[in-house]
């Protein structure tokens, strides 16, 4: 396991970057493009299906060299090797971090030690589960798996939360055009009963199957929703004339309409799901890194095993790039270090992700969990405080909707917000605009290109004056530019492209975690809130008097109880 001898901001490389930032603070992107005629080609890279242009970022060649010097000083290459080799880099939970193993090709071998004289054949285990997932998906899609009344399954409802929901829900929406077998995925996550009610409203119980996704099968929100779903199923099947009385009837119904994604076989059985219908994953896979594991079962059912394997191919291409490319040509490294540059040296407080694709609408929310749950830490690996800003705050909406909502702040606000623009050359859906000839996708992409140009280069007072703008309006219409963006283009939004995009950001998160000296693979901040909620539940239900330990919480619960119907 690599060791970091000092905190990041005390290194010589950090100090050099601070000096560089001070010396170049007034540099304009206009100047950089003028001084470096080949800047665009010099700073554009390709990995798998992704074409990545970094040229509109606020940095020059020297700055990039200094950032990579910092990466080396922090041991990034050693940490990268440790992760891929299966070392326990998740030190607070003493676990390996092997989400990259989930997409190992079938012809690759990979094992890790699990004891003094034992090894686990990780590659074989992964492909065994993928094989079972493939068989299950084929059974659903062919109609050989049927509900208790003999109806084929048309609706697959994933019940999970966090990483057991955000990943497959995002991917299912993004890969909508690949759902050709008549199976529609749905997703329930929130403990708010409106979620389960709204999702199940209008579904045919006889053709609905539920996937209960919980590693431990103890997640309170997921189990509450699973029981609510079974009550809905039994009620609707009873209305259809099905016998739902007695343990045997309920067991038969559950066997036909419920499967589990979990590691807790005993608890899965207690719920009534046969363990032969349980799809496992491992403690070396964190929830937010698990969409390509059995957590993606509902996705595989919807898009089919072949396209799911293409999804994994996209991940693996970026994994290989990240693992083998030198830092100077390594896209996740460069993008991760640019995030550190903006956060720690230029004072950026958030990072926008702007996919110009309605199908990618949930991608920013997915990245919020990936980045903020991973790097939202204030303690280093050795238990000492992080003394510099850490953890990028990700947010965003699809274009062009965002242009009419928050782009005003990006263009003329006082906050520096680096932004990633994600676009696709060829659409799955296109239509003709109002003029009867122009492609609507071409209109979308003209906005895509225009926004990155205006953010970078703006429009100054002299240019406005030449256009005849009234003097009193010129200050209001000046677009300062110098807003940094990264542009990611792909030929089409395919399963492989989506897998590559997800892996790109996974490795960006890893890079930044190494620089800040934090564990990107635990989430203790989530755990305390769960415990507090369980402790307060008796007071919220009225079974006990509230004694939370602070007057605000006690008074709020009292108000809630007073007005609860």
Swiss-Prot record:
Alphabetical UniProt keywords: Cytoplasm, Gluconeogenesis, Glycolysis, Isomerase
An annotated GO cellular component: cytosol
EC code(s) of this entry: 5.3.1.9
Active site: 373 (proton donor), 404, 530
Any one Gene Ontology BP term: glycolytic process
Single Gene Ontology MF annotation: glucose-6-phosphate isomerase activity
UniProt enzyme class: isomerase
Keyword Cell cycle among record annotations: no
Pathway stated in the Swiss-Prot or TrEMBL entry: Carbohydrate biosynthesis; gluconeogenesis; Carbohydrate degradation; glycolysis; D-glyceraldehyde 3-phosphate and glycerone phosphate from D-glucose: step 2/4
Reaction(s) catalysed (UniProt annotation): alpha-D-glucose 6-phosphate = beta-D-fructose 6-phosphate
Subcellular location: Cytoplasm
Pfam families hit by this protein: PGI (PF00342)
Similarity comment: Belongs to the GPI family.
Described purpose of this protein according to its UniProt entry: Catalyzes the reversible isomerization of glucose-6-phosphate to fructose-6-phosphate.
HAMAP family named in the record: G6P_isomerase
Name the record gives this protein: Glucose-6-phosphate isomerase
Biological source species: Corynebacterium jeikeium (strain K411)
